[in-house]
């Protein structure tokens, strides 16, 4: 059932969401080849230059044919946030609408989709000294202990943040210590929702087994394409280290540990696939709470009929 209300003359925005390894890029490219849409990437790892294989980044040839915004905009030494993504995406949406085209936001970073659709409240800037202290406490006691502390002051945030998600635990505790208010309270205050009608399509595999097969196949393909060499080149840079957000991306942290001698290649494969499965599980949990979905599709259904479905939506049908 469609929840998007299309008014004549109101420019829409399209969302193409789904867990990892469900073919979102292929579907987005197919739409861009057939319809007047322009792709905006919604992926916290694709923003980084030099991280191509482990992110399944579209090839240079494909990007030349079908441009994607918000890919290769940062160096891996830099941090990126949901707030910055929202600002960048809104600017891109305005430009695409001004050109008479339709923005297609495609990816799997669910926090970015939420920030764009529902807005973000004003949050304090990062405090380097406080972050160093929290990292020191985590080194001494583990991120699980800090997650327990977060549960005491912001149970809502703790419920949605994985106990191993160091970056988000750190940020939630930082906000609490800087403001005396929980991240959840601040995020509910003063949000500005997206002002355009949204057509929202979600890709979801038919079964967990099929998704796991897709994930294993893709990770093996990444290894065959030179993923280890890609991380080795990044690891040689003196300004990059394992704790950076870019290097904590799924797959990259496992290859980094392999290069540190923590385990052998077969264990790398097992851990990389397991980490990707866990990532997909979190994405699916998030998606199941998503509201206003125009249609849920399997990858096969999307491949066979998504352009026609989106075309009907754009024509008001």
Swiss-Prot record:
Pfam families: IPPT. One of its GO terms (biological process) is tRNA modification. Substrate binds at residues 20-25. The keyword Nucleotide-binding applies. The keyword Transferase applies. InterPro entries: Dimethylallyltransferase, IPT, P-loop_NTPase. It catalyses: adenosine(37) in tRNA + dimethylallyl diphosphate = N(6)-dimethylallyladenosine(37) in tRNA + diphosphate. It comes from the Bacteria. Its EC number is 2.5.1.75. ATP binds at residues 18-25. Keywords: ATP-binding, Magnesium, Nucleotide-binding, Transferase, tRNA processing. Gene3D superfamilies: 1.10.20.140, P-loop containing nucleotide triphosphate hydrolases. GO terms for molecular function: ATP binding; tRNA dimethylallyltransferase activity. Its cofactor is Mg(2+). The record marks 109, 131 as: Interaction with substrate tRNA. Residues 43-46, 167-171, 281-288 are annotated as: Interaction with substrate tRNA. PANTHER family: TRNA DIMETHYLALLYLTRANSFERASE. Monomer. Belongs to the IPP transferase family. Catalyzes the transfer of a dimethylallyl group onto the adenine at position 37 in tRNAs that read codons beginning with uridine, leading to the formation of N6-(dimethylallyl)adenosine (i(6)A). This is tRNA dimethylallyltransferase.
């Amino acid at each position: 059932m469609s929840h998007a209300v299309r008014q004549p003359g109101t420019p829409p925005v399209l969302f193409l969401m789904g867990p990892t390894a469900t073919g979102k890029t292929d579907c987005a490219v197919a739409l861009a080849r057939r319809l007047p849409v322009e792709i905006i990437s919604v992926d916290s790892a694709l923003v980084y230059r030099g991280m191509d294989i482990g992110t399944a980044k579209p090839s240079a040839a494909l990007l030349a044919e079908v441009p994607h915004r918000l890919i290769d905009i940062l160096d891996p030494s830099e941090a990126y946030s949901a707030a910055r993504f929202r600002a960048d995406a809104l600017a891109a949406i305005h430009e695409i609408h001004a050109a008479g085209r339709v923005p297609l936001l495609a990816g799997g970073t669910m926090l970015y989709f939420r920030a764009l659709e529902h807005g973000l409240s004003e949050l304090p800037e990062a405090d380097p000294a406080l972050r160093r202290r929290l990292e020191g406490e985590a080194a001494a006691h583990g991120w699980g202990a800090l997650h327990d502390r977060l549960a005491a002051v912001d149970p809502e945030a703790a419920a949605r943040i994985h106990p191993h998600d160091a970056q988000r635990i750190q940020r939630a505790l930082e906000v609490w210590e800087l403001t005396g208010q929980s991240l959840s309270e601040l995020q509910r205050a003063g949000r500005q929702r997206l002002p355009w009608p949204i057509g929202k399509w979600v890709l979801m595999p038919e079964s967990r087994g099929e998704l796991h097969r897709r994930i294993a196949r893709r990770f093996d393909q990444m290894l065959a394409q030179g993923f280890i060499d890609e991380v080795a080149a990044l690891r040689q840079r003196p300004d990059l280290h394992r704790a950076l957000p870019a290097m904590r991306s799924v797959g990259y942290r496992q290859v980094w540990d392999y290069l540190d001698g923590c385990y052998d290649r077969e264990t790398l494969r097992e851990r990389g696939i397991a980490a990707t499965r866990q990532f997909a599980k979190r994405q699916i949990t998030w998606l199941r709470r998503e509201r206003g979905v125009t249609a849920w599709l399997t990858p096969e259904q999307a491949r066979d009929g998504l352009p026609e479905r989106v075309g009907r939506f754009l024509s008001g049908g």
